[in-house]
Amino acid sequence: MIEFRNVSKVYDQTVALDGLNLTIESGKIIGLIGHNGAGKSTTIKSLVSVIHPTSGEIIVDGQELSSNRLAIKEKIGYVADSPDLFLRLTANEFWELVASSYGMTLDEVESRLAYLLELFDFEGHRYEVI
């Protein structure tokens, strides 16, 4: 089950989501329909951790998304309709996403990422948007 509990997202002064409450039962397939600017893309990008809500909670199978992003990403399939999927990710988030698609655990991702960042002298850029 996926639950959005009072989820809001504000970009600068623009409110993209305003207290969204939504429950999607396990096994259901849904579509989001609405006019431009209604918050459809923001809702999906929040669910797959491309962006983070300003407030509220997203719960997937009883786990709060912000405290367990990698484990939850393993349960959700997402294909972007535009090539901007990676434009707002930090280096750390990008490699977590790529590694999780290969079935790596969070510990494996952290260990491997630490090794690669040190190898290429990139540690100082881990949390910068790429």
Residue positions per predicted region:
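Helix-to-loop junction immediately C-terminal to a conserved catalytic motif
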Residues: V48
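Conserved ABC transporter NBD signature motif
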Residues: G56-S67, A71-I72
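Conserved ABC ATPase "signature" region
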Residues: E96, S100, D107-H125
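Short coil-to-beta microelement around the adenine-binding A-loop and adjacent beta1/P-loop entry
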Residues: T14-V15, L70
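Walker A (P-loop) phosphate-binding loop of ABC-type ATPase nucleotide-binding domains
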Residues: H35-G39
